[in-house]
Amino acid sequence: MAFQSPLTFNDEQLTVAQLKSQLDLFANAQKQAFLNHHPVTDLVLSRAEYMDLLLTRLWRYYGFSEIHNISLVAVGGYGRGELHPLSDIDILVLSKHKLPGELETKLSEFITLLWDLRLEVGHAVRTVEECAAIGREDLTVATNLQEARLLCGSENTFQDLKKVVLSDSFWPSETFYRAKIQEQRERHARYHDTTYNLEPDIKSTPGGLRDIHTLSWVARRHFGATSLLEMSRYGFLTDAEYRELVECQDFLWRVRFALHIELKRYDNRLTFAHQIQVAEHLGFKGEGNRGIEMMMKEFYRTLRRVAELNKMLLKLFDQAIINGGETEPAVIINEDFQRRGRLIEARKPALFQARPETILDMFLHIANDSTIDSVSPPTLRQLRTARRRLNKFLHTIPEAREKFMELVRHPNALHRAFSLMHKLGVLAAYLPQWSQIVGQMQFDLFHVYTVDEHSVRLLNHINTFSYAKNHDKHPICCEVYPRLQKKELLLLAAIFHDIGKGRGGDHSEIGEKEAYDFCIEHGLSKPEAKLVSWLVRHHLLMSVTAQRRDIYDPEVITEFAKQVRDEERLEYLVCLTVADICATNPELWNSWKRTLLAELFYSTQRALRRGLENPVDVRERIRHNQQLASALLRKEGFTAREIEVLWQRFKADYFLRHTHKQIAWHCEHILRMDNPEQPLVLMSKKATRGGTEVFVYTKDQHALFATVVAELDRRNFNVHDAQIMSSKDGYVLDTFMVLDQHGQAIDVDNHKAVIKHLMHVLADGRPTKVKTRRTPYKLQHFKVKTKVDFLPTKSKKRTLMELVALDTPGLLAITGATFADMGFNLHGAKITTIGERAEDLFILTSENGGRLSEEQELQLREKLIHNIAELAP
């Protein structure tokens, strides 16, 4: 990189314009060097060196070098000699005595010039005494001063500061260590104590650069080590750990450098908006989002390695240095292990290398003994070494297979062993397939965890089904799970359900075969292996059916029951499905989904018990609903004749698709109407099927569905289900299942306003124009190709249309308006949002009441794609 050294700038070059030009040349040279794969360490160090020269030249220009007893000092990251393109340049103007006013004015001009150059300068002007006083009270200041580096000015003044900072009285090593540990805990808590965040902060997230800094700060305070290399020389790190930390730091630096050259303002968050460009800069390429997912996989794996090293090394430091090697007395477990306090440790230094299967033994002891919380630091170091020296996966060792199955069958392994096995890399060392999903992310808003993290959370959710206290949240699973004969089959299905992701092809099919082979290899019977592999293959079946199919259609229930075949499979599947949803995204599970899955579960259970050769008698169900609804209405004072006259206007489908309580509720208000010409809008005061039911009764009008959903969308409510029905005499009986933005039923306090506005737009009779709103920030960075598919159905009267599109505001309203404009009748809708994707099902008929023709389907597809494309403002 050829550029002029700032020390050689003449006075004419020290104008804002000239200096900006020189800084731009330097920045562009660094950017080009980075894109040409120049080592990032050289670039980070050379940027700090360039700033050293520039600040030194300006210091001299302002005449500060002629003044005794003041120094210009780099602190913080700049003090370490590390600067990324947008890093803060933290400087300290240090003096022995308080500066006179005229000198402070001149220093202010110096700092203002740096700001005019658009440099992110953080500065302080302090005496040595002030630094000492503030540093003793403020951990951040103390840490920055520890990394102080003289740029120019008085060496003596700087050495006075160093004497203060290095003295034991400034921050005793143990006090500093405890404070930094607490600081790290608080920082990790801000990121939910996980390395897996969708838009991670490269610097501050657990496993990020700050975790490496914390190690260096602690070692510097205790040993005086000024680099990772010196830390290894003091024995704080082994050579292998030193190389690993350097490798991790190098990757994180490359990610941060790539991010900074894309930004105009300082930020360390790897947002969706910038993941694409960063991946490209780092050479990660692939079809679609493959490049991003590959880059983020490497990123998350690096965070895991740093987090593991950070935790282990700090504990070793605490045990060996702070506590002087004193430990609690050992309690012998067997010839291989002992317990010391709440930690398990190996009794032999090379146990895991000599007999790798004992790694699994250790976790069996953890599962057995509730007094053991984790692994001792020396044993963790031994485990890390053994893990890296394994020449084959653990599952290839017969003894290890036996112990793994012992763990899978152990009643305490779910909540005591598996999460720790994953965290310490043992699952990846056991299963080659698991090692492939570690850090595997999906570039979307639906999956908030990497595949491995999601799978472990799924196992943890399964464990919650064992406790009666969770019955209200998971009534079916808490009833079903305890009676499963072989819970280990469910756990194996959970481990394998997503194991095929990231390898191309259908992950369910990949996992199905690998799960079967694994089960046979581990001594399970063929029927057991078939059940596990079936669960893996169909782990999405129940969720998709409940949320995206009309589960009140007997045909849908029959088809689902045929795939499930028996109640045993149904019970395993419902537990896997619920745990899968809960482990995908903490915001996904709500009373609406619970109700849908419960209705599908019990409907299928009844179908299986009745026998699939004995379908539901539709007429009997209608009669049953009418009898119960009529009894409720008569209690309210209505005569049988009034009820009969009203029901003669309704079609049979109405009585089939509503419960008797819904029918009675609707009809009571219809019969009490003073003016049948006015619209009627009802909202259920109690949550119905997990949401708020909005019922609309009015004369049919053009684009009524679009009008209602547009009004609800305007109020930030989400329609999840709609049943669109008409009476024989031209009235609509439409039911919308609505949730608020948090997936809950609408607050009763809002009902009056919602009803008022809906009645107003319905009485107006004119279709509500779909108002476009700005696409939410997070959605702006995702592309979802609009797809319109027409699904096969046995019905000769109706068409099933599936729409996949970006979940843009107004999507449902514009879809409904398109149906109306083309003269198609909408009979039902199932609305599903999967992160940034809308996956909606609509039941349609033509203007004549029959199925859409192929030509009509083609026209509808083209029109919808066109109208949705114009939605975005």
Swiss-Prot record:
It holds the Pfam family HD. Residues 693-773, 800-873 form the ACT domain. Residues 451-573 form the HD domain. Uridylyltransferase (UTase) activity is inhibited by glutamine, while glutamine activates uridylyl-removing (UR) activity. One of its GO terms (biological process) is regulation of nitrogen utilization. Residues 333-692 are annotated as: Uridylyl-removing. PROSITE patterns: ACT (PS51671), HD (PS51831). One of its GO terms (molecular function) is [protein-PII] uridylyltransferase activity. Gene3D superfamilies: Beta Polymerase, domain 2 (3.30.460.10), cca-adding enzyme, domain 2 (1.10.3090.10). Its EC number is 2.7.7.59, 3.1.4.-. Keywords: Hydrolase, Magnesium, Multifunctional enzyme, Nucleotidyltransferase, Repeat, Transferase. Belongs to the GlnD family. HAMAP family: PII_uridylyl_transf. Modifies, by uridylylation and deuridylylation, the PII regulatory proteins (GlnB and homologs), in response to the nitrogen status of the cell that GlnD senses through the glutamine level. Under low glutamine levels, catalyzes the conversion of the PII proteins and UTP to PII-UMP and PPi, while under higher glutamine levels, GlnD hydrolyzes PII-UMP to PII and UMP (deuridylylation). Thus, controls uridylylation state and activity of the PII proteins, and plays an important role in the regulation of nitrogen assimilation and metabolism. This is Bifunctional uridylyltransferase/uridylyl-removing enzyme. The lineage of its organism: Bacteria, Pseudomonadati, Pseudomonadota, Gammaproteobacteria, Vibrionales.
